[in-house]
């Protein structure tokens, strides 16, 4: 893994703007260690509770291997997408899912680019059994769900790979819903807290730039500006 830079470099407003590094338009920022990377997805209680207990996403029959599953490495984007777990019952539990780096990068190597959630229709999901991994770049969000001028990656795992992902590539599952709710409550009380302060309070994870080979960057169109 090449040298990574804290997401603090991109979110915290410093006094001298000229000293800040500009954030590339397309960049993966994630929580990871030497062996694994964390991605997020929100599920209903009937799926999430058994998944955490048994450390298997398909522990419940409600988890459908026949559907495309979307995951994202950005905590703030997951908060936006799920409404901090309050959006609806199908997203009431936010799970932090750990994958080994080689499996995560293998998913990315199979990717084709889409251009937004609106393109992921039920027909496309049904075709997912024979589809490639789908990647889209959506506007990154602040912890308070404000839109940022650069993009965050979302990864659609097709049905053809879902069973392998669930059975072999997921190495850890944690329910982080209470952290999401605590973040929302804290921001409702004080919206001026910095990223650093939220990290210190353990309300958001520290995310770093996730470096990729030039070949993977080309697959993901990471040098595109729109």
For the regions a protein language model found, what residue spans apply to each?
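ADP-ribose/NAD+-binding catalytic cleft of ART/PARP-like enzymes
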Residues: 4-65
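Partner-binding and oligomerization surfaces adjacent to conserved cores of proteins
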Residues: 21-22, 26-42, 55, 81, ...
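Non-catalytic, substrate/partner-engaging modules appended to enzymatic cores
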Residues: 31, 35-38, 130-134, 150-152, ...
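Structured loops at beta-to-helix junctions and adjacent beta-edge loops in soluble globular domains
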Residues: 41-43, 100, 138-140, 156-160
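Internal, well-ordered alpha/beta segment that forms a basic, Gly-enriched binding/recognition surface
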Residues: 135-137, 142-149, 155
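Glycine-rich, aromatic-bearing surface loops/beta-hairpins
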Residues: 166-226
């Amino acid at each position: 893994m090449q040298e990574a830079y804290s997401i603090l470099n991109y979110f915290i407003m410093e006094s001298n703007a000229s000293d800040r590094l500009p954030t590339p338009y397309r960049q993966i920022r994630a929580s990871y260690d030497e062996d694994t990377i964390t991605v997020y997805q929100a599920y209903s209680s009937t799926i999430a509770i058994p998944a955490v207990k048994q450390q298997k996403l398909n522990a419940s029959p409600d988890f459908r291997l026949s559907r495309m599953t979307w995951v994202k490495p950005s905590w703030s984007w997951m908060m936006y997408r799920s409404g901090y777990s309050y959006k609806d019952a199908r997203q009431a539990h936010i799970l932090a899912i750990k994958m080994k780096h080689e499996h995560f990068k293998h998913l990315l190597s199979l990717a084709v680019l889409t251009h937004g959630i609106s393109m992921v229709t039920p027909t496309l999901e049904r075709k997912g059994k024979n589809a490639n991994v789908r990647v889209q770049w959506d506007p990154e969000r602040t912890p308070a769900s404000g839109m940022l001028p650069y993009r965050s990656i979302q990864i659609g795992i097709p049905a053809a790979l879902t069973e392998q992902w669930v059975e072999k590539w997921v190495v850890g599952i944690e329910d982080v819903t209470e952290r999401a709710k605590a973040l929302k409550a804290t921001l409702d009380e004080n919206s001026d807290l910095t990223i650093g302060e939220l990290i210190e309070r353990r309300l958001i994870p520290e995310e770093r730039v996730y470096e990729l080979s030039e070949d993977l960057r080309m697959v993901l169109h990471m040098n595109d500006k729109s």
